[in-house]
């Protein structure tokens, strides 16, 4: 069992990487999972969980269910179970479940503990660590949420064996995102190694990167913005396709390529660096065909990104490999010219 400590100002917690241990709780626990994960992994968790009382709430699977209705269902289950401030919630699932349970636990009784048990690669390397929580709205993705750190995170690689290839590759996109912005050595490892032979090490390295970033910038005031590489465009893609055509990681892969196009046009990436990132995405089958339906509407959606300020879009753009820059005040004409390639 490997451990990563995340020491923050208000609380410390650990990420455990290895076989899911027995979890002993003296309080009530509400498990929230989705309709697919519950069938695959809920019995495994229930075997290892000892609590004062356990209840299970199952939400429909998919990004489009990360909404007010699902949030209300979670909270209603908590009220019916009479959870108190000493009780906790357990998120068993991917990024959607992690985000929703984190948010629900942050607002129930003004905040109770929750444990993250991520079952997808994307959730293990990204969504389950760092405390960003939220739900989607008709206006955009993750526009309502909070910062609420988990009590603990348990990552069992056995969960990943049940993932379809497409879901696994979507998680790799988030690893590439972190590598390109923060760690040139991880980029080289992904380029030269067979991921199957070093998966645990890559997950550990990715979580370590995110942990270091979160410790430095918990509330996303500066360096943590790098974790949003590909997300300004990616969230607009998800919204335009009604969260149905692409998995989150797939949309982020497209978003990274759009960001690379913009960085290349601004002289922040050389053609060699641009092609290097492109080839890495190709290696993991993360090149997708996508055409923007309405160029003007897509451009306007970019302003709904949470990083935008004073009617200015902020883009996270790679500055070479292993570094990034927050770019703003980019002329509309420059952005539109880049987007025309995708129209």
UniProtKB/Swiss-Prot annotation:
InterPro entries: Dehydroquinate_synthase (IPR050071), DHQ_synth_AroB (IPR016037), DHQ_synth_fam (IPR030963), DHQS/DOIS_N (IPR030960), DHQS_C (IPR056179)
EC number: 4.2.3.4
Pathway listed: Metabolic intermediate biosynthesis; chorismate biosynthesis; chorismate from D-erythrose 4-phosphate and phosphoenolpyruvate: step 2/7
Catalytic reactions of this protein: 7-phospho-2-dehydro-3-deoxy-D-arabino-heptonate = 3-dehydroquinate + phosphate
Residues bound to NAD(+): 61-66, 95-96, 119-120, 132, 141-142, 159-162
Binding-site residues, Zn(2+): 174, 231, 248
GO biological process: amino acid biosynthetic process; aromatic amino acid family biosynthetic process; chorismate biosynthetic process
Pfam families tied to this protein: DHQ_synthase, DHQS_C
Transmembrane segments: none
Compartments (UniProt record): Cytoplasm
Task of the protein: Catalyzes the conversion of 3-deoxy-D-arabino-heptulosonate 7-phosphate (DAHP) to dehydroquinate (DHQ).
Similarity comment: Belongs to the sugar phosphate cyclases superfamily. Dehydroquinate synthase family.
UniProt-recorded name of the protein: 3-dehydroquinate synthase
Species name: Helicobacter pylori (strain ATCC 700392 / 26695)
């Amino acid at each position: 069992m490997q451990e990563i400590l995340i020491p923050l100002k208000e609380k410390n917690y650990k990420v455990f990487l290895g076989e899911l241990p027995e979890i002993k709780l003296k309080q009530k626990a509400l498990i929230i999972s989705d309709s697919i994960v519950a069938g695959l992994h809920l019995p495994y968790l229930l075997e290892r969980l000892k609590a004062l009382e356990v209840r299970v709430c199952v939400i429909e699977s998919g990004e489009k269910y990360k909404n007010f209705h699902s949030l209300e269902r979670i909270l209603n289950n908590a009220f019916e179970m009479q959870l108190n401030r000493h009780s906790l919630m357990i998120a068993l699932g991917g990024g959607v479940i992690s985000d929703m349970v984190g948010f629900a636990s942050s607002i129930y009784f003004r905040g109770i503990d929750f444990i993250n048990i991520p079952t997808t690669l994307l959730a293990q390397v990204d969504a389950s660590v760092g405390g960003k929580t939220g739900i989607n709205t008709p206006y955009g993705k993750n526009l309502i949420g909070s910062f609420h750190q988990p009590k603990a995170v348990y990552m069992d690689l056995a969960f990943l064996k049940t993932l379809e290839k497409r879901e696994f590759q979507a998680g790799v996109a988030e690893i590439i995102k972190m590598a390109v912005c923060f760690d040139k050595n991880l980029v080289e490892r992904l380029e030269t190694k067979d991921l199957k032979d070093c998966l645990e090490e890559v997950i550990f390295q990715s979580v370590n990167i995110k942990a270091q970033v979160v410790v430095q910038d918990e509330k996303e005031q500066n360096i943590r913005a790098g974790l949003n590489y590909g997300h300004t465009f990616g969230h607009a893609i998800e919204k335009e396709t009604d969260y149905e055509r692409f998995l989150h990681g797939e949309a982020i892969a497209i978003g990274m390529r759009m960001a690379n196009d913009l960085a290349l046009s601004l002289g922040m990436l050389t053609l060699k660096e641009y092609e290097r990132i492109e080839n890495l995405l190709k290696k993991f089958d993360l090149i997708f065909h996508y055409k923007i339906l309405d160029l003007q509407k897509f451009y306007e959606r970019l302003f709904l990104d949470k990083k935008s300020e004073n009617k200015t879009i902020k883009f996270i753009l790679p500055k070479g490999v292993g570094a990034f820059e927050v770019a703003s005040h980019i002329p509309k004409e420059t952005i539109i010219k880049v987007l025309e390639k995708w129209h």
